[in-house]
């Protein structure tokens, strides 16, 4: 038995780790957050990209991706995490590709990234989807659920409302989903008088609509 296996068994017995199917996870959330903060200290954009690529090649890639995203999306307050996402999604980003974003794994990563640095996600989404023809937007299917959820978060934040709402409108005009929380439904919810799906005030939302109508 390796030293690693012995340590895993030791912390499982103490209840610090817990088994989840074929994987093992950290049980106390504060400790898990502390560990990812420590891990981030030594990450560069290149190393984060390599890490994501390794996950995507693993047999358990869906489980590993979801586990990573659940932890990483809690790092919105961490300057290192924000800077990493900003650089990772900057110029010549490997993620600036519609096929990558529309994949199950790629779209899930963006659901995590948007909680850490919505401005960086907004910038890249606008670059990829901003001028995409309707017929191409209609072909976005595999990752569409995650893309719409990511756009919801962009629409909610004041600093990314206009870009997020513009993209949501584009997807709504190229709708291919039938459930109520599709892009069309979520765009409509931005403009209700009471309990809108955004933190932006009514005046600013009205100005956005008038501007779109004029165009």
Residue spans for each PLM region:
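C-terminal leucine-rich, beta-strand-based interaction scaffolds used for sensing/assembly
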Residues: 1-159, 169, 181
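HEAT/HEAT-like alpha-solenoid repeats
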Residues: 44-45, 200-206
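Flexible loop/turn segments at the boundaries of HEAT repeats in alpha-solenoid HEAT proteins
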Residues: 121, 194-202
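Basic, amphipathic N-terminal segments
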Residues: 133-136, 174, 190
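Extended, low-complexity, amphipathic alpha-helical coiled-coil/linker regions that act as scaffolds
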Residues: 167, 181-184, 200
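Hydrophobic residues within the alpha-helices of tandem HEAT/HEAT-like
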Residues: 187-195
């Amino acid at each position: 038995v390796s030293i690693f296996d012995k340590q895993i068994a030791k912390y499982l017995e103490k209840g610090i780790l817990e088994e989840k199917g074929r994987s093992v996870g950290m049980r106390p959330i504060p400790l898990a957050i502390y560990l990812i903060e420590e891990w981030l200290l030594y990450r560069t954009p290149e190393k984060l990209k390599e890490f994501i690529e390794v996950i995507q090649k693993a047999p358990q890639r869906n489980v590993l991706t979801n586990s990573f995203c659940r932890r990483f999306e809690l790092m919105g307050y961490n300057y290192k995490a924000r800077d990493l996402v900003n650089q990772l999604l900057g110029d010549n980003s490997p993620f600036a590709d519609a096929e990558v974003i529309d994949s199950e794994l790629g779209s899930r990563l963006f659901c995590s990234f948007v909680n850490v640095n919505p401005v960086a996600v907004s910038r890249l989404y606008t670059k990829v989807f901003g001028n995409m023809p309707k017929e191409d937007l209609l072909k976005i299917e595999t990752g569409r659920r995650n893309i719409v959820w990511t756009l919801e978060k962009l629409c909610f934040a004041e600093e990314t409302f206009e870009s997020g709402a513009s993209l949501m409108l584009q997807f709504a005009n190229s709708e291919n989903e039938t459930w109520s929380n599709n892009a069309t439904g979520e765009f409509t919810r931005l403009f209700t008088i009471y309990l809108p799906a955004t933190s932006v005030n009514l005046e600013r939302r009205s100005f956005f609509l008038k501007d779109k109508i004029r165009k």
